[in-house]
Regions:
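Peripheral, non-AAA+ core regions of ATP-driven protein-machinery
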Residues: 1-152
Length: 152
């Protein structure tokens, strides 16, 4: 099963749309991240695995693939952690639903850490019809600069 969430990466001060596609399928228990993922994104593997188990869920013991599209854009950010984790929980049947934009780096203990480049991302989200955004509490003041979205 696979799920997909909208997200972004920054090129200068411009937010570029990115789709975080998360797939879980039968096979060897490997975890791959594809789509020009930089070092901080590759390190998400350990943060996501630890955060899921620290939060009382089971990390899927199956083949796991995350595709960050478009592939031609290099991604050097850690805010894909949250949509990856939620995607794995949905795809493995541990959660039943989730929607909206989800942004945040995960600590090994499951704590949501703040992200950078938020205002251009939220403007992009609003332009694309997004209504709800899940983000770290530390980013709420900055998020308040962009009206028309509901923040959790």
């Amino acid at each position: 099963m696979s799920v997909s969430f909208p997200s972004y990466c920054l090129q200068g001060l411009t937010a570029i749309p990115v789709q975080v596609e998360v797939g879980v399928s039968p096979g060897m228990p490997i975890f791959s991240i594809i789509g020009m993922a930089g070092t901080s994104v590759q390190e998400s593997k350990d943060r996501v695995r630890s955060a899921i188990t620290s939060s009382g869920f089971s990390f899927p013991l199956t083949r796991k693939v995350v595709n960050l599209a478009p592939a031609e854009v290099i991604k050097h950010v850690s805010h894909f952690d949250l949509p990856m984790a939620i995607g794995f929980l949905l795809a493995s049947g541990q959660l039943s639903e989730a929607e909206g934009w989800m942004l945040g780096e995960l600590g090994l203990n499951g704590v949501l850490r703040p992200v950078s480049g938020l205002v251009p991302a939220l403007l992009l989200a609003r332009e694309n019809g997004v209504k709800e955004v899940v983000l770290p509490e530390e980013n709420l003041a900055e998020a308040g600069l962009v009206e028309g979205l509901t923040y959790y």
